[in-house]
């Protein structure tokens, strides 16, 4: 008599998918409160799995973006400092920026006009003037799964070299700084490195 071995991982996944059917909310109405070149900000009503209705629920769409953990040939990490309106403070963070789209808008179903790696190379060059031939994709993840539908893609760039000058967008006002690994660790511990996705990027990139 032959026995078929069951893959426990597959079984658990199937059980999870079945259970998830009882967790999903159904969006039953949507109002676009703000819809301009920068954001699609919505007010929605959702139906719980048990039939109750919850409203309002606010969410938004913006374009996907990239974060680059970049280091130079001396092993120092290339960062930028700029003002962040949400917390109304100047923060230290890694070079980052949006993936370009064919229609130039921040949201919608229009296809991106560049791959994420192309976007990362462009953003690093535009913000810092540095370029690299050593790139590694670390992770693509929702930037804020609770209220947004865009994704952040994290890259590691090593042995970066100065290849040109900054070419900043009209909305960018920033300065370039270099830090050692220990200095970045200290800034994170002391709450001076305040972009959550950038802290995650650092943890992914350590030792790589």
Predicted regions and their residues:
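Conserved hydrophobic/aromatic beta-strand scaffold that supports enzyme active sites
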Residues: 41-43, 69, 79, 154-156, ...
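Acidic/glycine-rich phosphate/pyrophosphate-binding loops and surrounding catalytic core
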Residues: 131, 135-136, 142-144
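Nudix hydrolase/Nudix homology domain
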Residues: 3-5, 17-18, 22-25, 90, ...
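Active-site-adjacent beta-strand/loop module that shapes the phosphate/pyrophosphate-binding cleft
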Residues: 45-50, 144-163
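Conserved Nudix-box catalytic region and its N-terminal flanking loop in Nudix hydrolases
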Residues: 62, 67-69, 76-122, 168-171
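Acidic, metal-coordinating catalytic segment for phosphate/diphosphate chemistry
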Residues: 31-67, 73, 82
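Intrinsically disordered, low-complexity terminal tails and inter-domain linkers enriched
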Residues: 4-21, 104-111
């Amino acid at each position: 008599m032959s026995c078929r071995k069951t893959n426990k991982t597959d079984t658990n996944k199937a059980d999870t998918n079945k259970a998830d059917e009882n967790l999903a909310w159904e969006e039953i109405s949507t109002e676009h409160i703000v819809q301009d070149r920068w954001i699609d900000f919505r007010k929605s009503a959702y139906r719980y799995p048990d039939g109750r209705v919850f409203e309002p629920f606010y969410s938004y769409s913006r374009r996907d973006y990239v974060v680059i953990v970049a280091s130079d040939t001396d092993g120092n990490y290339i960062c930028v400092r700029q003002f962040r309106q949400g917390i109304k403070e100047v923060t230290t963070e890694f070079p980052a920026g949006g993936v370009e789209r064919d229609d130039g808008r921040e949201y919608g179903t229009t296809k991106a006009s560049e791959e994420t790696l192309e976007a990362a190379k462009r953003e690093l060059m535009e913000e810092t003037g540095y370029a690299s031939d050593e790139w590694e994709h670390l992770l693509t993840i929702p930037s804020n799964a609770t209220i947004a539908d865009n994704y952040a893609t994290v890259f590691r760039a090593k042995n970066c070299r100065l290849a040109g000058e900054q070419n900043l967008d009209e909305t960018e006002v920033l300065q370039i700084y270099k830090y050692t690994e220990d200095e970045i660790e200290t800034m994170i511990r002391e709450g001076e490195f305040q972009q959550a996705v950038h802290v995650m990027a650092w943890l992914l990139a350590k030792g790589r």
